[in-house]
Regions:
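Short amphipathic
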Residues: 51-54, 67-75
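A structural signal for small-residue-enriched, beta-sheet-centric alpha/beta enzyme cores
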Residues: 82, 115-124
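Long, well-ordered mid-to-C-terminal structural blocks that present hydrophobic/aromatic surfaces
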Residues: 190-248
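Short beta-strand-to-loop capping motifs
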Residues: 73, 131-135, 228-232
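Single conserved hydrophobic/aromatic residue that forms the stacking wall/gate
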Residues: 254-263
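Alpha-helical metal-binding/catalytic segments enriched in His/Glu/Asp
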Residues: 1-11, 71-73, 80, 87-103, ...
Length: 263
């Protein structure tokens, strides 16, 4: 006999599947049937792990004579971290961080605010940061961003033709993230892998293993939270890519949450 199980509310956290009681079904083999298109079924799925890290920071004073501005990444297509990860689209968190890292090495930069991405299973489309740099460097910063934007927009001209970098003046911020934490945060985002890690050796064109740097959020209590998700159709590779991300977090000496929702 064939048993059919229909669950609901899977996209928000597999709540239907997790509520399934042991022994409810009798079969030895489970075929997962899934699709976003009516009339089509996918047989099989990737397992996944969410890897989360949290920075605790101190607030420090922004020195007088510093100019505050907001740097934004906009116009990316984003997409599903499973179905679209192979398309090579830009990740707003990675691209913003790339410019912030460059800027922090060149100027006396204070990171006041950072925010990027939203859902754990979506490729980040937008991100922004509020930074403060010496007044004397504000014109040079705009030139730097123009040069940087031209280079990166050329890199993504085919897959993300609407990519934009925007620089806007911002009201003065009295406080910023302490320099040590800001440096470790930028280094962590830079080093954290994102994208396809391995392709299937059995099915041409099928992604086997991937990872998504989903979001960077400031939380109450002086917390900055980085959420990532790893997927693989092979259990050992899933654990391997999750360990890779976890190792990057450990090198930054930050708090790491236990992997959530492994499946």
């Amino acid at each position: 006999p064939i048993e059919c199980l229909f669950t609901v509310d899977e996209e928000t956290g597999l709540t239907g599947a997790f509520a399934l009681k042991e022994g409810f079904m009798n079969g030895d083999i489970l075929l997962n049937l899934d699709s976003e298109d009516e009339g089509e079924l996918f047989i099989g799925c990737a397992g996944g792990i969410d890897s989360v890290a949290e920075f605790t920071y101190r607030e420090v004073d922004v020195p007088t004579g510093h100019f505050c501005c907001k740097v934004q990444v906009k116009g990316l297509k984003g997409g599903h971290s499973g179905g679209d990860i192979h398309l090579g689209r830009g990740n707003a968190n990675k691209l913003l961080n790339r410019f912030l890292s460059q800027t922090s090495q060149k100027y006396d930069m204070y990171l006041c605010e950072i925010d990027g991405g939203n859902l754990r299973n979506a490729i980040a489309r937008e991100a922004y940061a509020v930074i403060a740099i010496p007044d004397a460097d504000k014109h040079a910063l705009r030139t730097d961003l123009n040069v940087f934007a031209a280079e990166v927009e050329a890199e993504y001209a085919v897959v993300d033709p609407d990519l934009q970098f925007v620089l806007e003046s911002e009201a003065a911020r009295p406080k910023a993230i302490d320099k040590d934490t800001a440096k470790r945060l930028l280094q962590t985002i830079y080093a954290a892998p994102h994208g396809v890690y391995a392709m299937s050796q059995d099915i041409p064109g099928l992604v086997e293993t991937s990872t998504n740097l989903a979001s960077v959020k400031m939380k109450p209590g002086h917390i900055i939270r980085i959420e990532t998700s790893q997927r693989s159709s092979t259990a050992s590779s899933k654990q391997d890519i999750a360990n890779m991300v976890r190792t990057v977090f450990e090198l930054s000496l930050i708090h790491i949450s236990e992997p959530t929702r492994p499946y």
